[in-house]
Amino acid sequence: MAPLRPLLILALLAWVALADQESCKGRCTEGFNVDKKCQCDELCSYYQSCCTDYTAECKPQVTRGDVFTMPEDEYTVYDDGEEKNNATVHEQVGGPSLTSDLQAQSKGNPEQTPVLKPEEEAPAPEVGASKPEGIDSRPETLHPGRPQPPAEEELCSGKPFDAFTDLKNGSLFAFRGQYCYELDEKAVRPGYPKLIRDVWGIEGPIDAAFTRINCQGKTYLFKGSQYWRFEDGVLDPDYPRNISDGFDGIPDNVDAALALPAHSYSGRERVYFFKGKQYWEYQFQHQPSQEECEGSSLSAVFEHFAMMQRDSWEDIFELLFWGRTSAGTRQPQFISRDWHGVPGQVDAAMAGRIYISGMAPRPSLAKKQRFRHRNRKGYRSQRGHSRGRNQNSRRPSRATWLSLFSSEESNLGANNYDDYRMDWLVPATCEPIQSVFFFSGDKYYRVNLRTRRVDTVDPPYPRSIAQYWLGCPAPGHL
């Protein structure tokens, strides 16, 4: 027995050393560490790379102040002293407000530049991209071969949109004809619309757009038989490419596209393409690893999704985002059969951000709260500087947790919603809900991804794009 004692001591020491190496003790703020076998950063839950003691050492107490609590197209103003509106909502809504110092922050930080930036001084129409904001459109004298710009765009014309997508920094872009818009927390950002060719280096109109929800957050624009891929606003080398080369089985001249995340790093990202009365589901073969994304700014949209993995909703995420086991394109299906309440043909589509039901104020508190500010999409980094990333890459206007709505209900001038019945706001359980937006003509629909049915609200869907997304006046309020 005595000869075994030294071996036992050595084994115990080895176990202690290994446990120390694989522990999160003292590592919770170091970020991703390529030299370690397990990780202790905020995204390790998504990548399934956490050390065994991550929860005990690093995971903060679950608080619901760092998540969205409503879909982005619902925002209610609770104000006892102002005019009542006769609209009553029947969806799960409620949420934090936009802080009033955002615009001051934007003005006070001129060094925080937009993500999009030119690839070269004067790019040809299809090989570069420029900043969407902060620089003047290039004079036509720099491009004598270009056609003259089309007639001035009318914001509230009611014409259909070609595409909607949110960029990796949380900015929301809408495309219509030759022009694109950037939408902020209220309506359209100052200086827009701009010609698509002056912002993205592509001659408009485009057919569809989406941004992948992974750590890289690359944006894809589709036109005819080709597609363009951008990273941090710069066109990737060797683009444009044929759709048939990059998305086998997807037709040319698509009408719309929307992207969904993988439920975890072991899952697959999906994109839905829509054309005519049919849609196609495409699954990506790979998603970038955490190590591959260390050299670039992290997608704020993906970061919000990935950090929600810490709150033990794995089963629900699998239900929402679990795809087929094989990558590639699925056979086309009919829109009207699988997306209940959506018209048989759509012009544009976009995935909304995930919000958490069951977090709205109780009826007794609802009318005491005043939510003065509103926003369609808003993401804030929870990571600090632990990864050594450039935190200025995100738009100042989307640098804090904003309210969960677009400007739908909040942009109706003096109409206030202080007569809501709030009992429906708090369901029996608290769980994530993913919305999908479909745009058709001058109207849009919001669909619950889990049920694939149009949400029931009053006033009902479809609703006006111009009124609720662009800040145009409601009929009778001109």
UniProtKB/Swiss-Prot annotation:
PTM annotation: Sulfated on tyrosine residues. N- and O-glycosylated.
Residue pairs linked by disulfide bridges in the UniProt entry: C24-C28, C24-C40, C28-C58, C38-C40, C38-C51, C44-C50, C51-C58, C293-C430
Composition bias, Polar residues: 97-112
Region spans: Heparin-binding: 362-395
Key word Transport present: no
Composition-biased stretches (Basic and acidic residues): 133-143
Pfam families referenced in this protein's UniProt entry, alphabetically: Hemopexin, Somatomedin_B
Positions annotated with a glycan in the UniProt record: N86, N169, N242
Biased composition regions of type Basic residues, renumbered to the chain: 365-388
Subcellular localization, as worded in the UniProt entry: Secreted, Extracellular space; Parasitophorous vacuole
PROSITE patterns named among the record's database cross-references: HEMOPEXIN, HEMOPEXIN_2, SMB_1, SMB_2
Signal peptide: 1-19
Subunit structure, interactors included: Exists in two forms: a single chain 75 kDa form (V75) and a clipped form composed of two chains (65 kDa and 10 kDa) (V65+V10) which are held together by a disulfide bond. Interacts with SERPINE1/PAI1, insulin and C1QBP.
Official protein name in the record: Vitronectin
Species whose genome carries this gene: Homo sapiens (Human)
